[in-house]
Regions:
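Ser/Thr/Asn(+Pro)-rich, low-complexity disordered segments
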Residues: 1-11, 95, 99-105, 123-125, ...
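Active-site recognition of the HExxH zinc-binding catalytic motif
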Residues: 160-184
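Non-catalytic architectural context of zinc metalloproteases
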Residues: 1-90
Length: 194
């Protein structure tokens, strides 16, 4: 944590960024490795962490993974994770994802995912990445959803607070490019208002 506090936080390692970093790695045979399909220079990723600090962070993360026996912890909590997944799936099944293309127009090469951030409290946010697939860049929007409730002893994501957030986060992949197209025309007024 000292490394994160001293070396990473001053450059924006907060809020959504730990998930952005985590999204770039996977665990293979108890080793944390880079995902090869993600576009390395996408977004502001390397403005917020240098490659040297990323490498150091990865080494510290690997040490934590081994020292904490994280895989055992994860395996012990699989029933909870499965229950959370099933509860969230009931929410995701209610979303008409085709509406986005009908309303905004078709969007090619976009992948949308929901990640469950069980320990982040009520916070919600999105992490954006790109990956190469079949010679094309694919935009990835990961909606990271915070805490859930219990209802009748079961994990519960209420539609009144869950659905609007997921819909909002996935709207960004359609709305942000529209904003970028007209930003020069609206930037003065937008800056004045916000």
């Amino acid at each position: 944590m000292e490394f994160v506090r001293k070396k990473l936080e001053p450059h924006g390692f907060s809020w959504d960024f730990p998930m952005a970093v985590a999204r770039r790695f996977s665990i293979v045979n108890s080793k944390i490795v880079y995902k090869k399909d993600l576009v390395a220079e996408y977004s502001d990723y390397y403005k917020r962490i240098s490659k040297a600090n990323e490498k150091k962070f990865l080494a510290l993360l690997q040490k934590f993974y081994a020292d904490s026996r994280f895989q055992k912890f994860y395996n012990n909590h699989l029933p909870l994770y499965k229950e959370c997944e099933e509860a969230m799936q009931t929410m995701v099944d209610k979303i008409d994802f085709g509406w986005y293309d009908r309303f905004f127009g078709p969007k090619q090469n976009c992948e949308q995912n929901v990640f469950l951030g069980i320990l982040i409290g009520g916070a919600n946010y999105a992490v954006h990445n790109k990956k190469s697939a079949k010679g094309k860049d694919v935009e990835i929007v990961d909606a990271v959803m915070g805490c859930c409730s219990k209802r009748d002893g079961r994990i519960y994501y209420g539609p009144e607070y869950t659905l609007p957030i997921i819909i909002h986060e996935f709207n960004h992949s359609y709305c942000n490019p529209l904003n970028e197209e007209v930003w020069e025309k609206i930037s003065d007024k937008a800056t004045e208002l916000y």
